[in-house]
Amino acid sequence: MAPPNGTTNGETEVATQGSYTAVSTGRKTTMHRLIEEHGSVLMPGVQDALSAAVVEKTGFHAAFVSGYSVSAAMLGLPDFGLLTTTEVVEATRRITAAAPNLCVVVDGDTGGGGPLNVQRFIRELISAGAKGVFLEDQVWPKKCGHMRGKAVVPAEEHALKIAAAREAIGDSDFFLVARTDARAPHGLEEGIRRANLYKEAGADATFVEAPANVDELKEVSAKTKGLRIANMIEGGKTPLHTPEEFKEMGFHLIAHSLTAVYATARALVNIMKILKEKGTTRDDLDQMATFSEFNELISLESWYEMESKFKNFTPKAT
């Protein structure tokens, strides 16, 4: 039976109820292999090295370096186009070092400029240990995909960026996601048209941001080619679904972009209120990690073991 969404350059796709099998003629990335193995991949967002370590130790296979979350954690600022590509690369390098077994995919916003800027950015992300990137078609300065006031560049302009990114990636183990924010300003059909154009330009997967309901999600799945991404934001425009539900709808990668930063913010606000009101936390220790739990999280004992190797130096006898 012919695949419902056709074939792509370099691979044959077979899609049934969200499953995906790629027969590669050259490149197959870590993310491709995860999707083949699991059908759909749940990818929590991370904002820093600590959150990445938590995600890895919890047993996830992939993580998403969320620009929204990094902007908040690093700068204390909203996702309003204020984060630079240099800061994104810096955050990514720390995250991949803290969680070396995760397949780390990065929110690349608009790529830092034109096609040549995109190519430099891609090479720096690869050097920083990333395994993939999202590149979106918003006008710069961009905004969070679930905020008001978004605008998009001409589709052909973003397609050139995707083509440039594909060239920069070459044979690297790096997964390219083309994101479109056209749903809000121009409607779902335009978002779908752009997604397919960007797939043709060289994207491994496409991401139509902020479908408003299940019917729109199903329409995206039915009308877009190749691998598809869904983004779950608590309180956002798209209703929350499980990976199994998304697999049935025909989505392959599910990002929970802001779960970690929202949970961190709530916990921090709550404990700071207690400390301000009571002047102590002695009756509320259950709201925090213990000293030993936290030390285990950051692998303290492994550092003691490494330290012990270098306590004494004995020169060779001559």
Swiss-Prot record:
Pfam families recorded: PEP_mutase (PF13714)
Region described as Disordered: 1-24
Binding site for Mg(2+): D107, D109, K142
Consequence the record notes for mutating D79A: Reduces catalytic efficiency 1000-fold
Reaction(s) the record says it catalyses: oxaloacetate + H2O = oxalate + acetate + H(+)
Induction: By ethylene.
Note accompanying the cofactor annotation: Binds 1 Mg(2+) ion per subunit. Can bind other divalent cations such as Mn(2+), Fe(2+) and Co(2+).
Alphabetical keyword list: Hydrolase, Lyase, Magnesium, Metal-binding, Transferase
CDD domains reported in the protein's UniProt record: ICL_PEPM (cd00377)
Gene3D superfamilies, A to Z: Phosphoenolpyruvate-binding domains
Domain of life: Eukaryota
Result, substituting C144A: Loss of catalytic activity
General function of this protein: Catalyzes cleavage of the C(2)-C(3) bond in oxaloacetate and in (2R)-alkyl malate derivatives to form oxalate and acetate, and alkyl carboxylates and R-ketocarboxylates, respectively.
Family under the similarity heading: Belongs to the isocitrate lyase/PEP mutase superfamily.
Oligomer status and interactors: Homodimer and homotetramer formed by a dimer of homodimer.
Protein name (record): Petal death protein
Organism: Dianthus caryophyllus
Lineage: Eukaryota, Viridiplantae, Streptophyta, Embryophyta, Tracheophyta
